[in-house]
Curated annotation (Swiss-Prot):
Belongs to the UPP synthase family. The keyword Membrane applies. This is Dehydrodolichyl diphosphate synthase 4. Pathway: Protein modification; protein glycosylation. GO terms for biological process: protein glycosylation.
Length: 289
């Protein structure tokens, strides 16, 4: 009963959101609650933390942003505010990545399996996605960040789909910084879709059996939108140690970093710890040296 009451309060906050305040809180709006900007990501374009070597930075960092709901519950906030805090943290995280010379950031925002959550929660999430992405189009343009959204977008609400198309069109010319958002994404679905595309092209006489190799296959995956489709580093927060059907093909030789910290609390220092761990590893890509 209490959990349902909590959930209904979260929904009510979303319904009142456009009237009471912007979709995402301004800095300091969570005053008297647990602060989410501890360790705010501020680093100059030319500045690299002393613990890190810039030449060893990953080109593509993927993140599974786990723990937003638990963070909200622990801090006495509504579920919707937990997602808001997580979205704010993602922008800070991506901004630091780009300043450190990391070209591509991909974030697992909503899995295909997440449709199994309570319908009200899913509706809340879709509403938040649409409001947030719409409100940040000018921000992405000002930072010259290209945004791509991947996943089975056929099921998402029409309003969100229109915003996705608008955002991708507005940022498609930017080359140096690339943020990939996976919404209704499934690694299995991605691989299955690639197989179907190859079979279809084969039937049309566009490719032969001997043409099919890893390079051709990767061009049919949804990560073909980026120059670096395979992440060098995957970070998952909240202590969970699984990939949850994310980038099943692309993660073949990726280095993993699992953090016990909930995503809204994954600050600059925690990210530096992940990068230090990554840079100390001997990447072998399956070979025995």
């Amino acid at each position: 009963m209490l959990s349902m009451l909590w959930f209904l309060l979260s929904l009510l906050s979303l319904l009142l959101l456009p009237c009471l305040r912007p979709c995402f809180p301004a800095k300091g709006s969570l005053k008297n609650k647990k602060k989410i900007d501890k360790g705010t990501y501020v680093v100059g374009e030319e500045e690299t933390p002393k613990e890190l070597q810039r030449e060893l930075m990953p080109r593509h960092v993927a993140v599974i942003m786990d723990g937003n709901r638990r963070w909200a519950k622990q801090t006495g906030l509504l579920t919707s505010q937990g997602y808001e805090a997580g979205a704010k943290r993602l922008l800070e995280f991506a901004d630091l990545c780009f300043k450190l010379g990391i070209n591509t950031v991909s974030a697992f925002a909503f899995s295909t399996e997440n449709w199994g959550r309570h319908k009200i929660e899913v509706k809340c999430l879709m509403y938040l996605f649409q409001r947030y992405l719409k409100s940040k189009i000018q921000f992405f343009q000002s930072k010259e960040i290209r945004v791509s959204v991947i996943g089975n977008l056929a099921k998402i609400p029409e309003s969100l789909l229109r915003t996705v198309h608008e955002l991708e069109e507005a940022t498609k010319s930017y080359k140096k910084k690339h943020l990939i958002l996976a919404i209704d994404y499934s690694g299995r679905f991605d691989i299955l879709g690639a197989c179907k595309n190859i079979v279809k092209k084969s039937e049309q006489g566009l490719i032969r059996e001997e043409d099919v190799d890893e390079t051709l296959f990767e061009r049919e995956l949804q990560t073909r939108c980026t120059e670096f489709p395979s992440p060098d580093l995957l970070i998952r927060t909240s202590g969970e140690q699984r990939i949850s059907n994310f980038f099943l093909w692309q993660l073949a030789y990726t280095e993993f970093f699992f953090s016990p910290v909930l995503w809204p609390d994954f600050d600059k220092q925690k990210f530096i710890e992940a990068l230090v761990s990554y840079q100390r590893r001997d990447r072998r890509f399956g070979s025995r040296l």
